[in-house]
């Protein structure tokens, strides 16, 4: 699949997720096969462009592949300025968020709230596309609510404005993340436009990914929540849809090693004052796939020292692997 002049390594993408798709997590997903990863959503408010938090969200390295940055806002000129600034910082793809269902985003008329105003959508897309010399993509939902599904209309507007690829999450804003993804509506969008369409929503296995690709005719799939605590999912999906082969999941030993490295990188990336707090939610997600009924989560969440976190986590993994007293962290 191509986005503008860029050939992606495969058709399996990691969704941009606020508070999750930082550099350490994107690196892990890319290692296991994500063909493209996106930064966390960046506000187009000029007051936050140069903050430390924004710099962390924009952090990128070559091993992550293409530098794709997602922006969110509602003012066309402000959106265009933000896109241009991000390109100056190294963004190779700009993604526009018109899919986020969060109230705090929608109250500012950003994210999926914009789907209620197709004329404003068009103004934003035209301004952003004309402001940068890199591909611009768009992420939407199927509409604001079930009575106002307009994803086909928005898709046509996007194509006319020069958007290079369109991601459709198969739910309305009103649905949030409840119910089942509307693959029929993603299929309708794909049939209505010529630009690449990326299917998103409820893709939690390699078989589901293959089904969604075949059913919708989409050019690629995007994985979001299913990757939490499960970055190796990309490996299984890539092998099935690109090579028609079923791959073995990484061994428990490999998973434990990767989790330890991920937590250590979070400590280094965010610093001692913040890294241990970010690590807690990731460990909780990882435990769901290793020992979902474990009380270890409470133990881990009570720790505020990064080094102690690593020691306790490795001891826990050693107990699971029956390798007691074999510690590599100090």
Swiss-Prot record:
UniProt enzyme class: oxidoreductase
Stored Pfam families: Dus (PF01207)
Binding positions for FMN per the UniProt entry: 16-18, 70, 139, 200-202, 224-225
Domain of life assignment: Bacteria
GO molecular function: flavin adenine dinucleotide binding; FMN binding; tRNA binding; tRNA dihydrouridine synthase activity
Xref: InterPro entries: Aldolase_TIM, DUS-like_FMN-bd, DUS_fam, DusB, DusB-like, tRNA-dHydroUridine_Synthase_C, tRNA_hU_synthase_CS
Cofactor(s), names only, from the UniProt record: FMN
Catalytic activity: a 5,6-dihydrouridine in tRNA + NAD(+) = a uridine in tRNA + NADH + H(+); a 5,6-dihydrouridine in tRNA + NADP(+) = a uridine in tRNA + NADPH + H(+)
Keywords, alphabetical: Flavoprotein, FMN, NADP, Oxidoreductase, RNA-binding, tRNA processing, tRNA-binding
EC number: 1.3.1.-
Active site: 100
Family classification: Belongs to the Dus family. DusB subfamily.
Role: Catalyzes the synthesis of 5,6-dihydrouridine (D), a modified base found in the D-loop of most tRNAs, via the reduction of the C5-C6 double bond in target uridines.
Protein's UniProt name: tRNA-dihydrouridine synthase B
Source organism: Haemophilus influenzae (strain ATCC 51907 / DSM 11121 / KW20 / Rd)
